[in-house]
Protein backbone atom coordinates (compact mmCIF):
# COMPACT_ATOMS: atom_id res chain seq x y z
CA UNK A 1 0.00 0.00 0.00
CA UNK A 2 1.43 3.40 -1.01
CA UNK A 3 1.35 6.03 1.71
CA UNK A 4 -0.99 8.94 1.09
CA UNK A 5 1.07 11.15 3.38
CA UNK A 6 1.38 14.57 1.74
CA UNK A 7 5.18 14.52 1.30
CA UNK A 8 5.29 11.00 -0.14
CA UNK A 9 2.45 11.87 -2.52
CA UNK A 10 4.24 14.98 -3.80
CA UNK A 11 7.55 13.26 -4.58
CA UNK A 12 6.30 9.88 -5.84
CA UNK A 13 6.72 10.78 -9.53
CA UNK A 14 10.12 12.48 -9.25
CA UNK A 15 13.17 10.97 -10.90
CA UNK A 16 16.84 11.85 -11.09
CA UNK A 17 18.85 14.12 -8.76
CA UNK A 18 16.79 16.59 -6.71
CA UNK A 19 17.54 19.80 -4.85
CA UNK A 20 15.07 21.11 -2.27
CA UNK A 21 15.35 24.80 -1.45
CA UNK A 22 13.88 26.95 1.29
CA UNK A 23 14.85 30.36 2.60
CA UNK A 24 14.12 33.50 4.54
CA UNK A 25 14.96 37.17 4.83
CA UNK A 26 16.54 37.58 8.32
CA UNK A 27 14.84 40.92 8.98
CA UNK A 28 13.84 39.95 12.51
CA UNK A 29 13.54 37.00 14.90
CA UNK A 30 13.04 33.79 12.92
CA UNK A 31 9.86 32.48 14.51
CA UNK A 32 7.76 29.35 14.84
CA UNK A 33 5.78 30.35 11.76
CA UNK A 34 9.00 30.28 9.71
CA UNK A 35 9.63 26.73 10.92
CA UNK A 36 6.83 25.56 8.65
CA UNK A 37 8.87 26.39 5.56
CA UNK A 38 12.11 24.73 6.55
CA UNK A 39 10.45 21.69 8.15
CA UNK A 40 8.20 21.23 5.13
CA UNK A 41 11.34 21.34 2.99
CA UNK A 42 13.11 18.92 5.31
CA UNK A 43 10.23 16.44 5.23
CA UNK A 44 10.18 16.61 1.43
CA UNK A 45 13.95 16.08 1.36
CA UNK A 46 13.63 13.02 3.60
CA UNK A 47 10.75 11.69 1.47
CA UNK A 48 12.91 12.02 -1.66
CA UNK A 49 15.84 10.32 0.07
CA UNK A 50 13.55 7.51 1.24
CA UNK A 51 12.72 6.85 -2.42
CA UNK A 52 16.41 6.27 -3.10
CA UNK A 53 16.94 9.42 -5.19
CA UNK A 54 20.07 11.53 -4.94
CA UNK A 55 19.01 14.65 -3.08
CA UNK A 56 20.34 17.88 -1.61
CA UNK A 57 18.70 20.38 0.73
CA UNK A 58 19.61 24.08 0.94
CA UNK A 59 18.44 26.99 3.08
CA UNK A 60 18.97 30.43 1.56
CA UNK A 61 19.50 33.39 3.87
CA UNK A 62 18.57 36.55 1.95
CA UNK A 63 21.04 38.79 3.76
CA UNK A 64 21.30 41.15 0.77
CA UNK A 65 17.71 42.26 1.34
CA UNK A 66 17.47 45.85 2.58
CA UNK A 67 16.06 46.88 5.94
CA UNK A 68 12.64 48.09 4.83
CA UNK A 69 11.63 50.05 7.93
CA UNK A 70 12.29 50.45 11.65
CA UNK A 71 10.41 47.47 13.07
CA UNK A 72 8.71 47.65 16.49
CA UNK A 73 11.52 45.65 18.11
CA UNK A 74 14.25 48.06 16.90
CA UNK A 75 15.40 51.37 18.36
CA UNK A 76 14.81 54.59 16.44
CA UNK A 77 18.55 54.68 15.74
CA UNK A 78 17.95 52.16 12.97
CA UNK A 79 16.28 54.83 10.85
CA UNK A 80 19.73 55.59 9.43
CA UNK A 81 20.06 52.01 8.13
CA UNK A 82 16.75 51.77 6.26
CA UNK A 83 17.49 50.75 2.68
CA UNK A 84 20.85 49.14 3.48
CA UNK A 85 21.49 45.37 3.12
CA UNK A 86 20.88 43.41 6.31
CA UNK A 87 24.40 41.98 6.12
CA UNK A 88 25.92 45.48 6.40
CA UNK A 89 23.87 46.68 9.38
CA UNK A 90 25.08 46.31 12.99
CA UNK A 91 23.35 43.75 15.20
CA UNK A 92 20.68 45.05 17.63
CA UNK A 93 22.85 43.81 20.51
CA UNK A 94 26.56 43.13 20.81
CA UNK A 95 29.05 42.87 17.99
CA UNK A 96 28.39 41.36 14.59
CA UNK A 97 25.95 41.89 11.77
CA UNK A 98 22.17 42.25 11.81
CA UNK A 99 21.53 39.27 9.53
CA UNK A 100 23.81 36.94 11.53
CA UNK A 101 22.21 38.08 14.79
CA UNK A 102 18.89 36.57 13.68
CA UNK A 103 20.26 33.72 11.57
CA UNK A 104 22.62 32.09 14.08
CA UNK A 105 20.00 31.13 16.73
CA UNK A 106 17.94 29.58 13.94
CA UNK A 107 20.90 27.53 12.71
CA UNK A 108 21.15 26.06 16.23
CA UNK A 109 17.45 25.21 16.08
CA UNK A 110 18.01 23.45 12.76
CA UNK A 111 20.69 21.28 14.33
CA UNK A 112 18.52 20.36 17.32
CA UNK A 113 15.58 19.51 15.07
CA UNK A 114 17.69 17.27 12.79
CA UNK A 115 17.38 19.54 9.75
CA UNK A 116 20.46 18.86 7.59
CA UNK A 117 20.07 21.83 5.23
CA UNK A 118 23.15 23.63 3.92
CA UNK A 119 22.85 27.31 4.82
CA UNK A 120 23.81 29.57 1.91
CA UNK A 121 23.91 33.34 2.22
CA UNK A 122 22.63 35.20 -0.82
CA UNK A 123 25.49 37.69 -0.45
CA UNK A 124 27.93 34.80 -0.96
CA UNK A 125 26.12 33.81 -4.17
CA UNK A 126 26.62 37.33 -5.50
CA UNK A 127 30.17 37.73 -4.18
CA UNK A 128 31.30 34.39 -5.64
CA UNK A 129 29.84 35.22 -9.04
CA UNK A 130 27.34 32.35 -8.93
CA UNK A 131 24.52 34.73 -9.82
CA UNK A 132 26.47 36.75 -12.39
CA UNK A 133 25.22 34.77 -15.39
CA UNK A 134 21.63 35.04 -14.16
CA UNK A 135 22.06 38.80 -13.61
CA UNK A 136 23.43 39.23 -17.12
CA UNK A 137 20.62 37.20 -18.69
CA UNK A 138 18.00 39.12 -16.71
CA UNK A 139 19.36 42.55 -17.63
CA UNK A 140 19.62 41.59 -21.30
CA UNK A 141 15.99 40.44 -21.19
CA UNK A 142 14.72 43.39 -19.19
CA UNK A 143 11.89 44.27 -21.56
CA UNK A 144 10.60 40.70 -21.55
CA UNK A 145 10.80 40.58 -17.74
CA UNK A 146 9.04 43.94 -17.49
CA UNK A 147 6.22 42.64 -19.68
CA UNK A 148 5.87 39.47 -17.57
CA UNK A 149 5.81 41.44 -14.31
CA UNK A 150 3.21 43.89 -15.59
CA UNK A 151 1.04 41.24 -17.23
CA UNK A 152 1.03 38.79 -14.32
CA UNK A 153 0.95 41.19 -11.38
CA UNK A 154 -1.34 43.73 -13.02
CA UNK A 155 0.92 46.59 -11.88
CA UNK A 156 2.43 49.17 -14.23
CA UNK A 157 6.22 49.64 -13.98
CA UNK A 158 7.12 53.28 -14.57
CA UNK A 159 10.35 54.50 -16.16
CA UNK A 160 13.31 52.68 -17.63
CA UNK A 161 13.29 49.23 -16.01
CA UNK A 162 16.41 47.26 -15.10
CA UNK A 163 16.07 44.04 -13.06
CA UNK A 164 19.08 44.97 -10.95
CA UNK A 165 19.46 47.12 -7.83
CA UNK A 166 23.02 48.47 -7.35
CA UNK A 167 24.46 49.03 -3.89
CA UNK A 168 25.45 52.69 -3.54
CA UNK A 169 29.11 52.81 -2.51
CA UNK A 170 28.56 56.18 -0.82
CA UNK A 171 25.38 55.88 1.29
CA UNK A 172 25.30 52.07 1.40
CA UNK A 173 21.69 51.79 0.26
CA UNK A 174 20.13 49.49 -2.33
CA UNK A 175 16.63 50.91 -2.26
CA UNK A 176 17.59 54.40 -3.53
CA UNK A 177 19.54 53.54 -6.69
CA UNK A 178 18.55 53.03 -10.30
CA UNK A 179 20.51 51.72 -13.28
CA UNK A 180 21.36 54.17 -16.06
CA UNK A 181 23.16 51.83 -18.44
CA UNK A 182 24.71 48.36 -18.56
CA UNK A 183 27.79 46.88 -20.22
CA UNK A 184 28.88 43.52 -18.83
CA UNK A 185 29.90 43.25 -16.06
CA UNK A 186 29.17 46.80 -14.91
CA UNK A 187 25.85 48.48 -14.20
CA UNK A 188 26.11 52.25 -14.23
CA UNK A 189 23.84 53.80 -11.60
CA UNK A 190 22.70 56.97 -9.92
CA UNK A 191 21.56 57.24 -6.30
CA UNK A 192 19.14 59.62 -4.64
CA UNK A 193 21.98 60.63 -2.33
CA UNK A 194 23.61 62.25 -5.38
CA UNK A 195 26.28 59.63 -5.98
CA UNK A 196 27.02 58.23 -9.44
CA UNK A 197 28.94 54.97 -9.83
CA UNK A 198 29.35 51.49 -11.28
CA UNK A 199 28.35 48.13 -9.74
CA UNK A 200 30.01 44.85 -10.75
CA UNK A 201 27.35 42.15 -11.14
CA UNK A 202 30.02 39.48 -10.46
CA UNK A 203 30.26 40.70 -6.85
CA UNK A 204 27.94 41.60 -4.00
CA UNK A 205 27.66 45.17 -5.29
CA UNK A 206 23.94 44.92 -5.90
CA UNK A 207 21.11 42.45 -6.22
CA UNK A 208 18.17 41.53 -8.40
CA UNK A 209 14.66 42.44 -7.17
CA UNK A 210 12.92 39.55 -5.42
CA UNK A 211 10.57 38.57 -8.27
CA UNK A 212 13.58 38.15 -10.55
CA UNK A 213 16.09 36.93 -7.98
CA UNK A 214 13.90 33.97 -6.98
CA UNK A 215 13.82 32.32 -10.44
CA UNK A 216 17.46 33.36 -10.93
CA UNK A 217 18.34 31.22 -7.90
CA UNK A 218 16.37 28.29 -9.35
CA UNK A 219 18.49 28.67 -12.48
CA UNK A 220 21.88 29.11 -10.80
CA UNK A 221 21.37 26.49 -8.08
CA UNK A 222 19.36 23.96 -10.12
CA UNK A 223 16.49 23.89 -7.63
CA UNK A 224 13.88 21.19 -8.37
CA UNK A 225 11.52 21.32 -5.36
CA UNK A 226 10.53 24.31 -3.24
CA UNK A 227 7.84 24.97 -0.62
CA UNK A 228 6.68 28.57 -0.14
CA UNK A 229 4.09 30.57 1.76
CA UNK A 230 0.65 31.55 0.51
CA UNK A 231 1.73 35.18 0.07
CA UNK A 232 4.14 34.09 -2.68
CA UNK A 233 1.61 31.68 -4.14
CA UNK A 234 -1.29 34.13 -4.42
CA UNK A 235 -2.64 34.82 -7.95
CA UNK A 236 -0.30 37.34 -9.57
CA UNK A 237 2.25 36.73 -6.82
CA UNK A 238 5.96 36.04 -7.02
CA UNK A 239 5.57 32.35 -7.89
CA UNK A 240 3.33 33.20 -10.84
CA UNK A 241 5.85 35.70 -12.18
CA UNK A 242 8.77 33.46 -11.21
CA UNK A 243 7.64 30.43 -13.17
CA UNK A 244 7.16 32.52 -16.33
CA UNK A 245 10.57 34.15 -15.93
CA UNK A 246 12.09 30.70 -15.33
CA UNK A 247 10.65 29.35 -18.59
CA UNK A 248 10.77 32.41 -20.84
CA UNK A 249 14.00 34.05 -19.67
CA UNK A 250 16.19 31.38 -18.07
CA UNK A 251 14.93 28.48 -20.16
CA UNK A 252 14.27 26.13 -17.23
CA UNK A 253 11.25 24.48 -15.66
CA UNK A 254 10.30 25.97 -12.27
CA UNK A 255 10.67 23.76 -9.20
CA UNK A 256 7.85 21.45 -8.12
CA UNK A 257 5.87 23.84 -5.91
CA UNK A 258 4.25 23.25 -2.53
CA UNK A 259 2.36 26.20 -1.09
CA UNK A 260 1.85 26.13 2.67
CA UNK A 261 -0.56 28.01 4.91
CA UNK A 262 0.38 30.14 7.89
CA UNK A 263 0.81 29.16 11.52
CA UNK A 264 -1.73 31.04 13.62
CA UNK A 265 -0.85 31.95 17.21
CA UNK A 266 -3.94 31.12 19.26
CA UNK A 267 -5.99 34.19 20.07
CA UNK A 268 -3.61 36.57 18.28
CA UNK A 269 -3.33 35.77 14.57
CA UNK A 270 -0.66 34.93 12.02
CA UNK A 271 2.93 35.34 13.20
CA UNK A 272 5.08 38.09 11.65
CA UNK A 273 8.54 39.24 12.74
CA UNK A 274 7.84 42.74 11.45
CA UNK A 275 4.88 43.25 13.80
CA UNK A 276 6.44 41.62 16.84
CA UNK A 277 3.58 39.08 16.91
CA UNK A 278 5.70 35.95 17.01
CA UNK A 279 7.45 33.41 19.20
CA UNK A 280 11.06 32.90 18.16
CA UNK A 281 11.92 29.39 17.01
CA UNK A 282 14.86 29.39 19.43
CA UNK A 283 12.44 30.26 22.26
CA UNK A 284 9.99 27.46 21.50
CA UNK A 285 12.84 24.96 21.18
CA UNK A 286 13.68 25.71 24.80
CA UNK A 287 10.27 24.54 25.99
CA UNK A 288 9.25 21.62 23.77
CA UNK A 289 11.23 18.63 22.47
CA UNK A 290 12.22 18.82 18.78
CA UNK A 291 10.16 15.74 17.90
CA UNK A 292 7.05 17.59 19.04
CA UNK A 293 7.82 20.63 16.90
CA UNK A 294 8.44 18.39 13.89
CA UNK A 295 5.18 16.53 14.53
CA UNK A 296 3.20 19.78 14.72
CA UNK A 297 4.31 20.53 11.15
CA UNK A 298 4.21 16.99 9.74
CA UNK A 299 0.70 16.10 10.92
CA UNK A 300 -1.09 18.90 9.04
CA UNK A 301 -1.32 19.03 5.25
CA UNK A 302 0.59 22.16 4.14
CA UNK A 303 -2.56 23.51 2.48
CA UNK A 304 -4.22 23.92 5.89
CA UNK A 305 -3.26 26.49 8.50
CA UNK A 306 -1.92 25.37 11.88
CA UNK A 307 -3.41 26.70 15.11
CA UNK A 308 -0.51 26.97 17.54
CA UNK A 309 -1.38 27.04 21.23
CA UNK A 310 1.81 27.10 23.32
CA UNK A 311 -0.27 26.44 26.45
CA UNK A 312 -2.66 23.50 26.77
CA UNK A 313 -2.25 22.80 23.07
CA UNK A 314 1.28 21.55 23.74
CA UNK A 315 -0.01 18.95 26.21
CA UNK A 316 -2.72 17.78 23.79
CA UNK A 317 -0.18 17.56 20.96
CA UNK A 318 2.29 15.61 23.09
CA UNK A 319 -0.43 13.15 24.17
CA UNK A 320 -1.30 12.57 20.51
CA UNK A 321 2.30 12.07 19.42
CA UNK A 322 3.22 9.79 22.31
CA UNK A 323 0.25 7.53 21.60
CA UNK A 324 1.36 7.21 17.97
CA UNK A 325 4.99 6.68 18.97
CA UNK A 326 4.04 3.86 21.33
CA UNK A 327 2.25 2.12 18.48
CA UNK A 328 5.08 2.85 16.02
CA UNK A 329 7.72 1.19 18.19
CA UNK A 330 5.60 -1.58 19.72
CA UNK A 331 2.99 -2.54 17.11
CA UNK A 332 3.57 -0.68 13.86
CA UNK A 333 0.97 -2.77 12.05
CA UNK A 334 -1.72 -1.04 14.13
CA UNK A 335 -0.99 2.26 12.36
CA UNK A 336 -2.06 3.12 8.86
CA UNK A 337 0.62 4.27 6.40
CA UNK A 338 -0.27 7.91 6.93
CA UNK A 339 0.11 7.70 10.72
CA UNK A 340 3.38 5.78 10.45
CA UNK A 341 4.76 8.44 8.08
CA UNK A 342 3.78 11.22 10.50
CA UNK A 343 5.79 9.56 13.26
CA UNK A 344 8.70 8.70 10.98
CA UNK A 345 9.12 12.28 9.76
CA UNK A 346 8.77 13.62 13.31
CA UNK A 347 11.51 11.55 14.92
CA UNK A 348 14.92 13.10 15.47
CA UNK A 349 16.29 9.64 16.29
CA UNK A 350 14.51 6.87 14.40
CA UNK A 351 16.10 4.07 16.41
CA UNK A 352 14.28 4.61 19.68
CA UNK A 353 11.25 6.24 21.23
CA UNK A 354 12.41 9.65 22.46
CA UNK A 355 10.32 9.97 25.62
CA UNK A 356 11.00 7.61 28.55
CA UNK A 357 8.19 9.49 30.35
CA UNK A 358 5.40 11.32 28.57
CA UNK A 359 5.54 15.11 28.59
CA UNK A 360 2.29 15.57 30.52
CA UNK A 361 3.50 13.30 33.31
CA UNK A 362 6.88 15.02 33.34
CA UNK A 363 5.12 18.35 33.93
CA UNK A 364 3.61 16.73 37.03
CA UNK A 365 6.93 15.32 38.23
CA UNK A 366 8.78 18.64 38.05
CA UNK A 367 6.16 20.08 40.41
CA UNK A 368 6.38 17.18 42.88
CA UNK A 369 10.16 16.80 43.09
CA UNK A 370 12.63 19.59 43.69
CA UNK A 371 15.68 18.28 41.84
CA UNK A 372 16.49 16.48 38.61
CA UNK A 373 18.12 13.66 40.57
CA UNK A 374 14.88 13.04 42.48
CA UNK A 375 12.95 12.86 39.22
CA UNK A 376 15.53 10.50 37.73
CA UNK A 377 15.27 8.18 40.74
CA UNK A 378 11.48 8.21 40.41
CA UNK A 379 11.45 7.16 36.75
CA UNK A 380 14.64 5.16 36.23
CA UNK A 381 13.20 1.86 37.43
CA UNK A 382 11.77 -0.15 34.59
CA UNK A 383 13.41 1.92 31.87
CA UNK A 384 15.00 0.09 28.90
CA UNK A 385 18.73 -0.52 28.79
CA UNK A 386 19.23 2.25 26.20
CA UNK A 387 17.83 4.88 28.59
CA UNK A 388 20.07 7.94 28.15
CA UNK A 389 20.21 10.03 31.30
CA UNK A 390 21.58 13.15 29.60
CA UNK A 391 18.70 13.16 27.10
CA UNK A 392 16.17 12.76 29.88
CA UNK A 393 17.66 15.68 31.80
CA UNK A 394 16.98 17.76 28.67
CA UNK A 395 13.36 16.62 28.75
CA UNK A 396 13.12 17.73 32.38
CA UNK A 397 14.33 21.19 31.38
CA UNK A 398 11.77 21.38 28.56
CA UNK A 399 9.00 20.64 31.06
CA UNK A 400 10.30 23.15 33.63
CA UNK A 401 10.58 25.97 31.10
CA UNK A 402 7.19 25.22 29.54
CA UNK A 403 5.66 25.31 33.02
CA UNK A 404 7.29 28.67 33.78
CA UNK A 405 6.53 30.39 30.46
CA UNK A 406 3.39 28.93 28.90
CA UNK A 407 1.50 26.63 31.25
CA UNK A 408 -1.96 27.88 32.25
CA UNK A 409 -2.69 28.21 35.96
CA UNK A 410 -4.94 25.15 35.80
CA UNK A 411 -1.86 22.97 35.21
CA UNK A 412 0.24 24.45 37.99
CA UNK A 413 0.01 23.20 41.56
CA UNK A 414 1.77 23.19 44.90
CA UNK A 415 1.76 20.18 47.23
CA UNK A 416 0.06 21.10 50.50
CA UNK A 417 2.07 20.48 53.69
CA UNK A 418 1.32 17.16 55.36
CA UNK A 419 -0.38 18.94 58.30
CA UNK A 420 -2.37 21.54 56.27
CA UNK A 421 -5.99 21.77 57.51
CA UNK A 422 -8.92 21.80 55.07
CA UNK A 423 -12.72 21.78 55.38
CA UNK A 424 -14.36 18.39 54.69
CA UNK A 425 -17.87 16.94 54.92
CA UNK A 426 -18.78 13.72 56.70
CA UNK A 427 -19.07 11.91 53.37
CA UNK A 428 -15.62 13.20 52.38
CA UNK A 429 -14.17 11.82 55.59
CA UNK A 430 -15.86 8.45 55.04
CA UNK A 431 -14.36 8.16 51.56
CA UNK A 432 -10.87 9.10 52.77
CA UNK A 433 -11.13 6.65 55.68
CA UNK A 434 -12.09 3.85 53.32
CA UNK A 435 -9.12 4.61 51.09
CA UNK A 436 -6.80 4.74 54.11
CA UNK A 437 -8.07 1.42 55.48
CA UNK A 438 -7.10 -0.37 52.28
CA UNK A 439 -3.84 1.42 51.58
CA UNK A 440 -1.51 -1.17 53.14
CA UNK A 441 -2.82 -4.10 51.10
CA UNK A 442 -3.01 -2.15 47.83
CA UNK A 443 -0.24 -2.53 45.22
CA UNK A 444 1.27 0.95 44.97
CA UNK A 445 1.17 1.76 41.28
CA UNK A 446 -0.83 4.21 39.21
CA UNK A 447 -3.23 1.62 37.77
CA UNK A 448 -4.13 0.15 41.17
CA UNK A 449 -4.67 3.60 42.67
CA UNK A 450 -6.89 4.58 39.75
CA UNK A 451 -8.94 1.38 40.07
CA UNK A 452 -9.27 1.86 43.84
CA UNK A 453 -10.72 5.35 43.37
CA UNK A 454 -13.39 3.93 41.04
CA UNK A 455 -14.20 1.12 43.50
CA UNK A 456 -14.73 3.67 46.26
CA UNK A 457 -16.97 5.83 44.07
CA UNK A 458 -19.15 2.78 43.35
CA UNK A 459 -19.22 1.74 47.01
CA UNK A 460 -20.37 5.20 48.10
CA UNK A 461 -22.65 5.61 45.06
CA UNK A 462 -21.02 8.87 44.07
CA UNK A 463 -19.67 10.30 40.84
CA UNK A 464 -15.99 9.33 40.31
CA UNK A 465 -15.23 12.94 39.38
CA UNK A 466 -16.30 14.12 42.83
CA UNK A 467 -13.93 11.61 44.42
CA UNK A 468 -11.11 12.83 42.19
CA UNK A 469 -11.92 16.41 43.23
CA UNK A 470 -11.79 15.40 46.89
CA UNK A 471 -8.28 13.99 46.54
CA UNK A 472 -7.08 17.05 44.62
CA UNK A 473 -8.40 19.29 47.39
CA UNK A 474 -6.61 17.20 50.01
CA UNK A 475 -3.23 17.24 48.26
CA UNK A 476 -3.06 20.48 46.24
CA UNK A 477 -6.01 22.57 47.42
CA UNK A 478 -7.59 22.71 43.94
CA UNK A 479 -10.62 21.08 42.32
CA UNK A 480 -8.62 19.71 39.40
CA UNK A 481 -5.13 18.41 38.91
CA UNK A 482 -2.84 15.94 37.13
CA UNK A 483 -3.77 12.33 36.42
CA UNK A 484 -4.54 11.13 39.91
CA UNK A 485 -3.11 7.60 39.78
CA UNK A 486 0.30 8.79 38.58
CA UNK A 487 0.16 11.76 40.93
CA UNK A 488 -0.47 9.79 44.14
CA UNK A 489 1.99 7.10 43.09
CA UNK A 490 4.76 9.68 42.75
CA UNK A 491 3.87 11.37 46.02
CA UNK A 492 4.65 8.02 47.63
CA UNK A 493 2.59 5.79 49.86
CA UNK A 494 4.10 7.16 53.09
CA UNK A 495 3.26 10.79 52.30
CA UNK A 496 -0.24 9.93 51.05
CA UNK A 497 -0.95 7.85 54.17
CA UNK A 498 0.33 10.55 56.53
CA UNK A 499 -1.50 13.37 54.75
CA UNK A 500 -4.87 11.56 54.82
CA UNK A 501 -4.40 10.58 58.48
CA UNK A 502 -3.74 14.20 59.47
CA UNK A 503 -6.73 15.47 57.51
CA UNK A 504 -9.02 12.93 59.18
CA UNK A 505 -7.52 13.59 62.64
CA UNK A 506 -8.24 17.33 62.32
CA UNK A 507 -11.93 16.51 62.12
From Swiss-Prot:
<dbReference type="InterPro" id="IPR020751">
    <property type="entry name" value="aa-tRNA-synth_I_codon-bd_sub2"/>
</dbReference>
<keyword id="KW-0648">Protein biosynthesis</keyword>
<dbReference type="GO" id="GO:0005737">
    <property type="term" value="C:cytoplasm"/>
</dbReference>
<keyword id="KW-0436">Ligase</keyword>
<feature type="short sequence motif" description="'KMSKS' region">
    <location>
        <begin position="270"/>
        <end position="274"/>
    </location>
</feature>
<dbReference type="GO" id="GO:0006430">
    <property type="term" value="P:lysyl-tRNA aminoacylation"/>
</dbReference>
<dbReference type="GO" id="GO:0005524">
    <property type="term" value="F:ATP binding"/>
</dbReference>
<keyword id="KW-0030">Aminoacyl-tRNA synthetase</keyword>
<comment type="similarity">
    <text>Belongs to the class-I aminoacyl-tRNA synthetase family.</text>
</comment>
<protein>
    <recommendedName>
        <fullName>Lysine--tRNA ligase</fullName>
        <ecNumber>6.1.1.6</ecNumber>
    </recommendedName>
</protein>
<keyword id="KW-0067">ATP-binding</keyword>
<dbReference type="GO" id="GO:0004824">
    <property type="term" value="F:lysine-tRNA ligase activity"/>
</dbReference>
<dbReference type="GO" id="GO:0000049">
    <property type="term" value="F:tRNA binding"/>
</dbReference>
<dbReference type="InterPro" id="IPR008925">
    <property type="entry name" value="aa_tRNA-synth_I_cd-bd_sf"/>
</dbReference>
<dbReference type="InterPro" id="IPR045462">
    <property type="entry name" value="aa-tRNA-synth_I_cd-bd"/>
</dbReference>
<dbReference type="InterPro" id="IPR014729">
    <property type="entry name" value="Rossmann-like_a/b/a_fold"/>
</dbReference>
<dbReference type="Pfam" id="PF01921">
    <property type="entry name" value="tRNA-synt_1f"/>
</dbReference>
<dbReference type="Pfam" id="PF19269">
    <property type="entry name" value="Anticodon_2"/>
</dbReference>
<keyword id="KW-0963">Cytoplasm</keyword>
<dbReference type="InterPro" id="IPR001412">
    <property type="entry name" value="aa-tRNA-synth_I_CS"/>
</dbReference>
<dbReference type="InterPro" id="IPR002904">
    <property type="entry name" value="Lys-tRNA-ligase"/>
</dbReference>
<keyword id="KW-0547">Nucleotide-binding</keyword>
<feature type="short sequence motif" description="'HIGH' region">
    <location>
        <begin position="26"/>
        <end position="34"/>
    </location>
</feature>
Amino acid sequence: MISLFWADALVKDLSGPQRVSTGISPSGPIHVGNMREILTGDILFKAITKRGLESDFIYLCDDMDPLRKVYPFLSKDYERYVGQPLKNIPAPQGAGKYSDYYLEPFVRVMKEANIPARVIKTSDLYESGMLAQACDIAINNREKIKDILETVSGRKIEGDFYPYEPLCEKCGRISTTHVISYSYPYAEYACKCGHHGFADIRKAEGKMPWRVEWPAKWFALKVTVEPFGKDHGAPGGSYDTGRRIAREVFGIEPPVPLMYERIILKGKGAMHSSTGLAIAASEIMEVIPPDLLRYMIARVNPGRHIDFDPGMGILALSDELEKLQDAYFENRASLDEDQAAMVEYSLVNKDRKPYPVDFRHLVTLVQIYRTEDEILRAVKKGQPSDFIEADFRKEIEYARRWLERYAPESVKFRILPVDQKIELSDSDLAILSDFLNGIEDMPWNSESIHDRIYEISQKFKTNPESVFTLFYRVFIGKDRGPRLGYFLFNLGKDFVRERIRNVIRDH
